[in-house]
Amino acid sequence: MDLIEAKQNFERSSRHPWENARLKTILHLFSRELEHANNEDGYILDLGCGDAWLINQLSQFYPNIQFVGIDIFFEGDDIKDLKELYQNSSLNLFKTLDNFHTAFEEIRFHAALMLDVVEHVEDDRAFIQELIESNTIDRDTKILVTVPAYQSLFSSHDHYMKHFRRYTRNTLGRLFMDLGITVERSSYFFFSLWLSRWFFVKFMDSETTKENTALAKWDKSRFITSLITGVLLIDAKIGLLSNRLGLGIPGLSVFAKGQLADR
């Protein structure tokens, strides 16, 4: 979860179905890379990790991986509080890449995740370029980026979350190409959420600032959470398959996976 939302309550036990479904979608999309890193006692970076919930969950499936979470919005005791909350020796949290370099010299990441983070950065190219030039990734590093889809859906929620933009498959693909990253696969997912957001933007949206979002205040029962998570997961899989078949079903999110091209 983004730190803007997470700081309202780090210790929530109930996670929003979108978070659960996105976790399982990442496990599906990145299973080969995660398995490879696990077999080699590798390192995986989550750049813009927020409350680090996702990589903490991933570590339960892949215990041999050292997960590194970096977020420039960590403040005060945030890192200490999260380490105490998760009690996970596979989780390494830092405010910057430089802080990571100080603790771990000459480490190359098997994979780098940027999950719903680059939309928060005014200069997305410079942000990813800094990672490329950091000597922590190379041509063998797999890169996975997820972002919110369709600028036409930009709403008060995006303003609240401090988003600069939303993306399409084409704009995300061009970002990769401009940075010398070869796109292996990209797709939209979460069609049902796209439909509901389209309706919201068209008929209900206002610029009223929100104190929190559905992610931060989710408090439904385990049954309801599991049910909606299951529906969203089916939705995501249908969207991924349809895009592979060239059907082009839209979604509220879009991802691209690739690696640095030979130079």
Q: What would you call each of these model-derived segments?
A:
Residues 173-187, 235:
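A SAM-dependent methyltransferase catalytic signature shared across enzymes that methylate proteins
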Residues 8-11, 145-165, 169-174:
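Short, glycine-/aromatic-enriched active-site segment of Class I SAM-dependent methyltransferases
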Residues 1-107, 111, 115, 125-128, ...:
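Conserved N-terminal segment of class I S-adenosyl-L-methionine
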Residues 136-143:
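Short glycine-dipeptide loop
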Residues 121-133:
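A short, conserved alpha-helix within the catalytic core of class I
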